[in-house]
Amino acid sequence: MPTPRLRQFWTLLILLTGTVASMFAASQWAWQRSLHAESDSVQRQLALYGQTLAQRIDRYRTLPEVLALDAQLQSALQRPLRPAEVEQLNLKLEQANGASQSSTLTLLNSDGLAVAASNWRSATSNVGQDYSFRPYVQQALAQGRGSFYGIGVTTGVPGYFLSQAIRDDHGHTLGLVVIKIALQELEREWLQTPDIVLASDAHGVVFLASQDAWRYRLLEPLDDEERSELTATRQYSDQPLRPLELRVDDRLDNGGRLVRLLSADLPPLPGRALWQTQPLPGTPW
């Protein structure tokens, strides 16, 4: 699988419109001063948004590592299983998933096939599904652990996947355990703010958004290699990935930009808006 080509950095983005619009009525000097002060304030606010997102993920980061040491899971990946044993594994993962309040826990063998899963009772159960094409599976089998954000190929529900290799006493990789973290609750929290808050991946695809219409937009055009990769990994399923068209009118010293929204299929913004970006340290985006 080709390595993603990083465009600049992974970003969290925000648009503020009301405050900026009111500034234009002030004198040029006062407006510039107020704009820079507002931009600095937004940058601090962005740091809080990013911290909240990172904390939501870090809450689950150790669970796959703990489960990878579980003797029952290790044993299950070294021999054929009877139906009763598969049911026991399903119940074990279901219980662990309920205690952690994650989205899904799945046990996969070294071929990327799901042996057991916490959602085994569901009509869209992961059990028996082939996930070998997913990057978080390939990463864990090759490097010991992996991470990936995408739409679930079985459930159709997006989430952040953390994977951990399961090894025997000799260090041979037997399979992996995967936790899927749903971030929809975080997006609902963003709805409480008047700002437009976005998070984009290495390809410039907006995967989290405070407003539904902004999700799965492209901040930059994709090249053929990137489109092929997204198709192969089925990262965003059949989402059309329409471009987010903006015009930059001005750039500030701290990286902020004044922009106008040009995408006709999005709700219009009142005039120019303040666009701020910030990398998300500690995440794979």
Residue ranges, per PLM feature:
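Core beta-strand residues in small-molecule sensory/regulatory alpha/beta domains
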Residues: 108, 167-168, 200
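Short, hydrophobic-rich beta-strand element in sensory/regulatory alpha-beta domains
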Residues: 64, 103-107, 197-198
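Juxtamembrane extracytoplasmic/periplasmic/luminal helical "stalk" adjacent to the first N-terminal
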Residues: 8, 15-79, 145
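Extracytoplasmic/periplasmic ligand-binding sensor regions of membrane-associated signaling proteins
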Residues: 117-189
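Solvent-exposed, extracytoplasmic
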Residues: 87-99, 176-234
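Amphipathic coiled-coil signal-relay and dimerization helices
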Residues: 75-76, 112-119, 206-210
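Extracellular/periplasmic juxtamembrane segments that couple receptor/chemosensory ectodomains to their
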Residues: 228-285
